[in-house]
């Protein structure tokens, strides 16, 4: 198992990044790939979790140990796989997530892609009261560089890759387009806030 990788960030796609470590490119699924844009072609440290299945060996990456700890707790819940856990983390309001779990706010939890009422209830049952301030609260995302409409397009692609439907995204795209000068990460955060209302 790997704890983290140190290497050069060489590629960003809607669901993954590629880190070159000693000439080997590691494909790593992350919650918000475009949050890494400012670090393109630089040395980065990414915390990872490896999932081994019969048909695939996958790496999931995190900006810090707290985000990884949250991911591990989420995938421990029956009904939440790695992709759903990444989609939940991508919302970037981890304190709100923890509050929703502790307060049994099923309506809030079911707004995440791949989380139905049954899974939300299981999250509450398995995770309520198990979060502490050092392990999961206050997870910060990477700072991303400035961008224009390309950033909005990247954000929409990333949200679709996380499981949000095109019809949902169309409803908020006009509002997002009015917010100029945001990074992909900021567009994603705004989109998630709009969809959570």
Swiss-Prot record:
CDD domains reported for this sequence: UBA_RuvA_C (cd14332)
- One Pfam family, please name it: RuvA_C
Where are the residues of the annotated region Domain I? 1-63
Report the principal subcellular site: cytoplasm
- Record text on subunit structure and interactions: Homotetramer. Forms an RuvA(8)-RuvB(12)-Holliday junction (HJ) complex. HJ DNA is sandwiched between 2 RuvA tetramers; dsDNA enters through RuvA and exits via RuvB. An RuvB hexamer assembles on each DNA strand where it exits the tetramer. Each RuvB hexamer is contacted by two RuvA subunits (via domain III) on 2 adjacent RuvB subunits; this complex drives branch migration. In the full resolvosome a probable DNA-RuvA(4)-RuvB(12)-RuvC(2) complex forms which resolves the HJ.
Give the similarity note: Belongs to the RuvA family.
- What protein is this chain from? Holliday junction branch migration complex subunit RuvA
What's the gene?
ruvA
